[in-house]
C-alpha cells in the first residue's frame, strides 16, 4: 500500500515507522521545510511543503495519515478524501462536531474510508475489561471513576500550536481524548454532563483549562466522574479507569491504562495479559501506550480483507461530541 504523511511533527515519526512496515511511504508534507525534508530523507519519500501540491502531483496514493494540529484535521482530511485517498486521522478527529460531520460527508461523497486513531483500545488491560463487559461478567455497571493526572510543563507549550484554542482546542482534545473514547466504547453515549474547569498552572501559556472535573450520566444509567489535570508535579502520575458493577470491581491503572491495578470479580480473574507496548515518548514528556503498530495492522487488514475496524469515523465524532458537551456545561477559562 502507498501512503502519504500530512504533518511531520513528533507523532508523524511513529506513523512513518509503521507505514514502512505495512507498505511504502511515498510522500510527506509539512509547512516547515526542514521537518518535511528530514522525514523524506529518512524514508526515501518525496517532500512537499503544501498539501495542495502533494495532492495534485501524487496520483497513486492509497492512504494519507493526517498528523497536523487538531484544528487543521478537518480541512486536511476533507481535501485528501476529495482527492480520492483513504484517510487515517490522528486524534482528535476534529475540535468541533460540525467539522466531524463535514469530514464524514466528504468520506461518503468520495467513496473513501475515514479512520481515526484510537490506540488505547489496543491496550491489553483495556481489551480484557472490554471483554468482561461484552460477556456481562460485571453484571450491571453502576458507576465509574476516570482519572487523568499528567504533566505538561511550560516547555511543552512554547513556540507551538499547543495551547491555542483555534489549533489545540483544549486539554481534553489533545491529552485525554483517548480516555473519553474508551468511555463511549465501553459504556455508550452520555446523557447529562456537568463540569468545572480551571487554569491554575499555565496562565499566560494556554487559552483554556489545565484542570477539570466532570460528572457524567450515561444513557444506560451509569454515573461517573472524570478528574483530569496536566499539573501532576514533574511527571505523569496516573491514567486510570475504575468500574463498579453488580458482580465485580476492576481498575485499569498505571500512567496510561497499561496495567490492571485492582480486580475483584465473581468467579473470574483477569490473568496472563501480554505486556503491551511502552508509552509514546516525546522528548521531555510521555503520551499514551504506543499502539500505532496495531492501528496500522487493523487499517491494512480492513482495506485488504474487510476485517472489522476499531477506528470508525462515527465513533471519532462521538468522542468530540462528549468533549464539546463537557466544555459547554462549564464556562471556558
Positions of predicted regions on the chain:
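Contiguous beta-strand/loop segments that form the cofactor/metal-binding neighborhood of enzyme cores
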Residues: 174, 180-259, 293-305
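Rossmann-fold dehydrogenase core element
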Residues: 102-119, 139-145
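Predominantly a Rossmann-like dinucleotide-binding segment in NAD(P)-dependent oxidoreductases
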Residues: 120-205, 333
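Hydrophobic residues in well-ordered beta-strands that form the structural core
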Residues: 49, 89, 114-116, 226, ...
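C-terminal helix-rich "cap/oligomerization" subdomain common to oxidoreductases
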Residues: 53, 63-66, 112, 219, ...
Amino acid at each position: 500500500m502507498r501512503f502519504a504523511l500530512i504533518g511531520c511533527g513528533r507523532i508523524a515519526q511513529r506513523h512513518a515507522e509503521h507505514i514502512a512496515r505495512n507498505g511504502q511511504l511515498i510522500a510527506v508534507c509539512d509547512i516547515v521545510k526542514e521537518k518535511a525534508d528530514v522525514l523524506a530523507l529518512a524514508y526515501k519519500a518525496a517532500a512537499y511543503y503544501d498539501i495542495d501540491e502533494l495532492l495534485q502531483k501524487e496520483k497513486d496514493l492509497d492512504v494519507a495519515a493526517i498528523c497536523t494540529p487538531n484544528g487543521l484535521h478537518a480541512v486536511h482530511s476533507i481535501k485528501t478524501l476529495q482527492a480520492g485517498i483513504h484517510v487515517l486521522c490522528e486524534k482528535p478527529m476534529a475540535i468541533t462536531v460540525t467539522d466531524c460531520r463535514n469530514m464524514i460527508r466528504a468520506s461518503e461523497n468520495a467513496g473513501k474510508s475515514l479512520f481515526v486513531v484510537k490506540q488505547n483500545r489496543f491496550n491489553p488491560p483495556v481489551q480484557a475489561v472490554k471483554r468482561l463487559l461484552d460477556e456481562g461478567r460485571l453484571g450491571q455497571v453502576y458507576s465509574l471513576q476516570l482519572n487523568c493526572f499528567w504533566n505538561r510543563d511550560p516547555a511543552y507549550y512554547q513556540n507551538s500550536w499547543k495551547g491555542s484554542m483555534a489549533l489545540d482546542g483544549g486539554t481534553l482534545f489533545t491529552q485525554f481524548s483517548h480516555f473519553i473514547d474508551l468511555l463511549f466504547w465501553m459504556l455508550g453515549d452520555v446523557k447529562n454532563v456537568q463540569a468545572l474547569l480551571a487554569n491554575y498552572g499555565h496562565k499566560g501559556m494556554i487559552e483554556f483549562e489545565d484542570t477539570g472535573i466532570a460528572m457524567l450520566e450515561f444513557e444506560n444509567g451509569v454515573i461517573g466522574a472524570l478528574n483530569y489535570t496536566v499539573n501532576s508535579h514533574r511527571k505523569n502520575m496516573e491514567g486510570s479507569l475504575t468500574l463498579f458493577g453488580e458482580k465485580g470491581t476492576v481498575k485499569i491503572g498505571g500512567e496510561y491504562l497499561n496495567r490492571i491495578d485492582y480486580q475483584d470479580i465473581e468467579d473470574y480473574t483477569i490473568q496472563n495479559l501480554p505486556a503491551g507496548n511502552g508509552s509514546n515518548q516525546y522528548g521531555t514528556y510521555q503520551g499514551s501506550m504506543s499502539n500505532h503498530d496495531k492501528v496500522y495492522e487493523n487499517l491494512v487488514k480492513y482495506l485488504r480483507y474487510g476485517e472489522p475496524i476499531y477506528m470508525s469515523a462515527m465513533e471519532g465524532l462521538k468522542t468530540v461530541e462528549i468533549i464539546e458537551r463537557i466544555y459547554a456545561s462549564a464556562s471556558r477559562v
